[in-house]
């Protein structure tokens, strides 16, 4: 009999914790790592061809996003709450998207905002904006006190191919940053 345990990811379930979305509810998540251990029989090949291992991770990520998983660094997770199904993973087919009147108004109001797609390289300017955001919105969250080296690691050492999208106002001041996964179907 062949040991298949290294061929498939292992899934785990978190304990329950207060739901961040619905007061009085609890949440639970199912998760797995995107960086599984290399296959025992293929270790030399993976070390010789690391991009093929990244390809495996990207295929796993793609497959899991199709069934509602989200990514946070090297972990993919989705809600797995016993008594609630309110969290919905939303995928919008871009070819079918039709802009609403309110979205047109918002776009017109913000027509002075520009964006630029960049490689996944962390900068101090991005980090300062992240700190400002955390201090104003997530001061009790898990990212409070993140260091620049931790931010740099999050941005630059991803198991998935990523890009940075920077948003700037008319004075070229950085006002938004999106660390974005590059995916075959997106």
Model-derived features with residue positions:
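A general structural-boundary detector
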Residues: 6, 51, 113-117
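Short, compositionally biased low-complexity segments
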Residues: 6-27, 94-110
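A conserved beta-strand-loop-helix scaffold within acyl/acetyltransferase catalytic domains
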Residues: 72-84, 89-186
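Non-catalytic peripheral regions of nucleotide-handling enzymes
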Residues: 1-5
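Acyl-donor binding region in acyl/amide transferases
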Residues: 9, 14-18, 23-66, 70-72, ...
């Amino acid at each position: 009999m062949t040991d298949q345990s290294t061929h498939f990811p292992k899934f785990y379930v978190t304990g329950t914790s207060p739901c961040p979305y619905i007061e009085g509810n609890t949440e639970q998540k199912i998760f797995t790592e995107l960086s599984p251990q290399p296959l025992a029989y293929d270790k030399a090949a993976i070390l010789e061809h690391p991009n093929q291992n990244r390809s495996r991770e990207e295929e796993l990520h793609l497959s899991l996003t199709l069934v509602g998983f989200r990514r946070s660094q090297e972990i993919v997770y989705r809600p797995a709450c016993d008594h609630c199904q309110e969290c919905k993973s939303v995928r919008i087919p871009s070819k079918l998207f039709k802009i609403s009147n309110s979205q047109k108004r918002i776009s017109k109001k913000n027509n002075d905002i520009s964006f630029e797609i960049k490689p996944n390289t962390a900068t101090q300017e991005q980090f300062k904006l992240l700190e400002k955001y955390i201090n104003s919105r997530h001061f009790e969250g898990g990212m409070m006190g993140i260091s620049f080296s931790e931010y740099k690691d999050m941005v630059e050492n991803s198991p998935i191919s990523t890009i940075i999208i920077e948003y700037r106002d008319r004075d070229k001041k950085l006002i938004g940053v999106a660390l974005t996964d590059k995916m075959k179907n997106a």
